[in-house]
Amino acid sequence: MNLILASQSPRRRELLGLMGLDFIVRVADIDETMDPGLDPFDEVARVSRMKALAVSREKGDVVIAADTIVVCEGKVLGKPRDEADAFRILSLLSGRDHEVMTGLTVLRDEEVITHTEVTKIHFRELYPEEIRAYIATGEPMDKAGAYGIQGGAALFADGMAGDYYNVMGLPVCRLAVTLRSLGLEIWGVRA
């Protein structure tokens, strides 16, 4: 049995490594476009399911796939296209609540388990100069919502409810429970 992470995200690799599991990375080549007319909660789950199905090849393999979005005032905020888009996104988040949603799919053979984890975040008021300085670090450019909570944006979030690691792109608590339900050991412990 292979444990496969269907993601090229270095943060997801790092977080899965915290669980003491040996895994291989197999990147899903799918269209991740979400339908803006559908509920983001359901859409992020659908994309994670598509990723898992795209890399599943051999019987017995366990595939982990995730997709993360940020939703603020009903708008889905993906990765910024450029620095101007990053500025627009971070300005929108300034002084507001938003939700980070991660669709998580674990697949083994015909069994497909999908959850959507939601973490609520509040950003304090941000100064335009600090937004520009943060963008200049390059950190926001490959992240949904144009920020990394584990990096410089830790200075922006003054409130959070839910799984911190979900904001980084992999809800590890939910994942551990799901993997154990399939009989996998985490840190040598089986459920």
Label for each model-derived stretch:
Residues 8, 28, 109:
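Cofactor-binding loop segments of dinucleotide-utilizing enzymes, especially the Rossmann-like FAD-
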Residues 11, 31-33, 112:
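Surface-exposed, flexible loop/turn segments at secondary-structure boundaries
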Residues 24-32:
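A short beta-strand-loop structural module common to alpha/beta enzyme folds
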Residues 2-4, 37-191:
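Anionic-ligand binding patches
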Residues 14-18, 35-36, 57-58:
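Short loop/helix-cap segments at secondary-structure boundaries that form the rim of catalytic
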Residues 22-24, 185:
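Residue-level detector of anion-binding/catalytic polar loops
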Residues 1-21:
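N-terminal beta1-alpha1 ligand-phosphate binding loop
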